[in-house]
């Protein structure tokens, strides 16, 4: 099985909250696509609660678009990581990490302004696969934590696992 890009970085040295360019590529028509690792939690030390990350998934996607789309950038998708330590964001364009960090912080401010669970987009049986598994309070706790700690930049060069270590770990 091929080694995915996300597993070539040392998760024991990853900071959080932090932005990292996980991958860049071009479409056959030459459009740049960038995938960002938006790391909310320190891997193997913290984890977002399932109800909170689910609610955040519903809110974060729209709020990030409000703050990041434009000037050559259009978000394709924002999805939670299975390990519940962050989100992957795929977009058209190549914004720098600081622009993404600023949009992320603004989106977290927006999450804190949501006053009622009824304001969560697509929170119904028709548009959500587990519409009863939500917590606005947990999502706001996550947002507050991000804003209190600020958002840093994780560098691929600093986090790269040495080739020898990758060979040792590869099954």
Curated annotation (Swiss-Prot):
InterPro entries: LuxS_sf, Metalloenz_LuxS/M16, S-ribosylhomocysteinase. It is an enzyme of class 4 (lyase). Its cofactor is Fe cation. Its EC number is 4.4.1.21. It catalyses: S-(5-deoxy-D-ribos-5-yl)-L-homocysteine = (S)-4,5-dihydroxypentane-2,3-dione + L-homocysteine. Fe cation binds at residues 54, 58, 128. Keywords: Autoinducer synthesis, Iron, Lyase, Metal-binding, Quorum sensing. Pfam families: LuxS. One of its GO terms (molecular function) is iron ion binding. Involved in the synthesis of autoinducer 2 (AI-2) which is secreted by bacteria and is used to communicate both the cell density and the metabolic potential of the environment. The regulation of gene expression in response to changes in cell density is called quorum sensing. Catalyzes the transformation of S-ribosylhomocysteine (RHC) to homocysteine (HC) and 4,5-dihydroxy-2,3-pentadione (DPD). HAMAP family: LuxS. Belongs to the LuxS family. PANTHER family: S-RIBOSYLHOMOCYSTEINE LYASE. This is S-ribosylhomocysteine lyase. It comes from Escherichia coli O6:H1 (strain CFT073 / ATCC 700928 / UPEC). The lineage of its organism: Bacteria, Pseudomonadati, Pseudomonadota, Gammaproteobacteria, Enterobacterales.
């Amino acid at each position: 099985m091929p080694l995915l890009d996300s597993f070539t970085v040392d998760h024991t040295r990853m900071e959080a909250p932090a932005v990292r360019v996980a991958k860049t590529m071009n479409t056959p028509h030459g459009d740049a696509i960038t995938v960002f690792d938006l790391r909310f939690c320190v891997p193997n030390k913290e984890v977002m609660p399932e109800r909170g990350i689910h609610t955040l998934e519903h809110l974060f996607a729209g709020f990030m678009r409000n703050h990041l789309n434009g000037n050559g950038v259009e978000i394709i998708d924002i999805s939670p990581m299975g390990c519940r330590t962050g989100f992957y964001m795929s977009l058209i364009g190549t914004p720098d990490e600081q622009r993404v960090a600023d949009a992320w912080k603004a989106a977290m401010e927006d999450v804190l302004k949501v006053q009622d669970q009824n304001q969560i987009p697509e929170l119904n049986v028709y548009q959500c696969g587990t519409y009863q598994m939500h917590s606005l309070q947990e999502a706001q706790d996550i947002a507050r934590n991000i804003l209190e700690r600020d958002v840093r930049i994780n560098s691929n060069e600093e986090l790269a696992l040495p080739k020898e270590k990758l060979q040792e770990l590869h099954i």
